[in-house]
């Protein structure tokens, strides 16, 4: 671990204790290059110390040294400025201080520092620019000033390096790769949620359609590339001036000025790339950025939860194929991470890397779409050639296959010598073809007429047939029986439909013989009273067919077998009943039927007039209902019985009815 040394030294007993505060002059912004060359994620520590023993606490910014990077003298810390801040107002500090943050919760921008470390280890001192050398010389002059300012102290004249690196030269590459692996397994964020101007690109920059701002950003960063492997190292520093990290819950404030780093320092790769296409192919987005689905260079296996080193990234890098372009990612959750990050205002540091455009991606997409369109065009042409047969309107599936089959069969017959062997082989293929086409859906589309009931019976769908037959009337069932043998068998299988059909046939036979079932309004109650001989003449009875009288022996209404004489009287009785029924159909609402006193034929009478008229033309007797004599009008009836009958008809509530009630 790096050791911390304070710039404040105590004098001996002769001198009083005093805190020496070294104020550094304002240097040009110097990025975190030399201070993080060999520092891994486990070697970072906080170098900001507060002198609490003094009356006024001061914030002392210490200098870090890394002597094993090929530099003659140690370099100065990336934050040469120093400010006095109180402990109370440290959370509100402006983002001009560059301090080394703590390792807790990955608050520092490790990704960029690790990229710089790997690049400096692989590169030589000759690959550095003149601006870097001027900055190093400036830092050396600063160190000399510090030594001169502290030379007056008697205790310590020589200053040792404040921070030393514990990483050896031979272990530098492996430790940096381990640091990359450890960093890739965590999520980092350099976006301040409290500020709106974060310098992030809009959503359109992440879409395949390039906007105006996106093209400008591509032009601005076209001279640099991102180091993705050890072979093609082209480090690129992408960032905005407003990128910073602020944590209100902690005391430590981590601010990383990136704009000055981009302005003053430029790194060149150790190997010259062949073309700009190789640079674009070498660009890749880490998995922890949440934009893995936008990269064209990653295969489906790399989209899984595989977290490896950058050597594994190089294995997966290559020219994508059409299958890879069409292939969709396995994990849709990573696709949903993009809008979530932009809504919350926190994105990974690799969002800056997404600002570099992939111009070759559009070419690749266009090429892939051209290949797919050519394939579809060839398929459509072949389909047109295949479907260019005639007479396919009836059965599109069957006739097409049969036509193709017969065409190949004729060719084989012409070439083959043994026709019998070929016929047997073709018969086997026909059987297999029929078995395949048996379950084909839509094989009979286009046919004008289709026997639906037969198709349902062929598929053994009896429940559907039962529903269809139940919805038909008895007459429709009788007609369906006479259509074909298949429909006759379908109706015969359904017992309920067959029973309805037989009943309908019986009714047709009864109508054909002229025997219609006639019923009166009150016949339902009188049919149960066959034993009442007094009302036998007026009971409504159904007429039996004429042909049945000669064949079957006649029976009385109560079930007794009648002799020929009795049967003749029964026939006379049935004729009387028929006459009553005919006259009853012509009655008005205020009329009733009564047998004529002379001929016992049905006669109409009116109860309020006490008058009846025989309906038989030969009789035509007009009689009084009370005395059954000829109608006498308003005169009293001649018989005494009429008087007695009149006395019986006592009006309710009259004096006679009251006397009768008293007598009772």
From Swiss-Prot:
Name of the protein described by the UniProt record: F-box only protein 43
Amino acid composition bias (Basic residues), ranges on this chain: 328-337
Modified residues (Phosphothreonine): 190
Taxonomic placement: Eukaryota, Metazoa, Chordata, Craniata, Vertebrata
Its job: Required to establish and maintain the arrest of oocytes at the second meiotic metaphase until fertilization. Acts by inhibiting the anaphase-promoting complex/cyclosome (APC/C) ubiquitin ligase. Probably recognizes and binds to some phosphorylated proteins and promotes their ubiquitination and degradation. Plays a vital role in modulating the ubiquitilation of CCNB1 and CDK1 during gametogenesis.
Annotated ranges, domain F-box: 445-502
GO-annotated molecular function: zinc ion binding
Plastid keyword on record: no
